[in-house]
Curated annotation (Swiss-Prot):
Domain of life: Viruses
Chain spans, region Disordered: 48-73
UniProt biased composition (Basic and acidic residues): 51-73
Protein name: Gene 30 protein
Species whose genome carries this gene: Bacillus phage SP01
Higher taxonomy: Viruses, Duplodnaviria, Heunggongvirae, Uroviricota, Caudoviricetes
Amino acid sequence: MSRIGQVCEAFRENHWEPATIISENGSLSVTVRYEDGETEELISNLVRNSELGHPEVKKEETTQQPEKGEGMAEPKIEGTCLDHFRWYNTITEKRPDNSKLFPVVSALMAVQYDKEGTYGSSWVGKGEHRGIMPNIDRKYDRLDTMTANEIEGKAKTLAQLESSFDSMNSNEKEALHESKIDAVADLANYCLLYMTFIKDNFPKMYNAWFEKNVPQYLRDKFPRL
C-alpha cells in the first residue's frame, strides 16, 4: 500500500518533526516535506507513523526556565540511537548491498533485545577468551555443520526450503525457527555484541579502529564517541 500523502513524523536534525510523505524511493527510503516546505530523503527507519494522523508537535523553547528542584523531569532525548544512522542521509550514491543492511540489522537488534530479557549478558560468559570467543566458536561450528550436511545431501538447503515453503504444513513451518538462518542470526549477533564489548572495555583501541576504518567524509556525521 502506498504511503504517499501520509502524515508522519520524520527525524530531522536531532528531533521528531511533523511531515508528509511525498514520494517512496523503493522499500528503503522515502521523501518527506516538512511544515516549513523543506523536503528531505530519509531511510524508512527515520520516519514513523503519527498517532491519529496528527504528529506530536515539538514544543518551542521558552526563555523562562524552571528552577532546579521544582520536580520537573529531565526531558527525554529521542532519537539518540538514530543519530548513528544520520550519515546515510548525506551520501549521494546509494549502494545496494549497504542499503539492505538496515532492515536486517534492525531485526537482529530486536531478536537480541528479547533474548537479553531472558538470558541477560550470558554471551560474555567468563570474558573475552573464556566466554565470548567460545560462544562465537560454538555458533560457527553449528553453522559449519549445517552447511556440511547440505553439501552431503543430509539436510535441505535454504533454496530447497524456499521453493517448498508454500506447500509445507504448519508444523513444518514451525520447525524452521531452528533453521540455518537462526544459526546465521546468532553468529551475527554474537559478533556485533563482541564489537560492543570492545568499545566498552577498550575505548582507545575502538576509537583508533573507528578513525582508521570509517572514512572521514562519513565520520564527521557521527555523534562524538
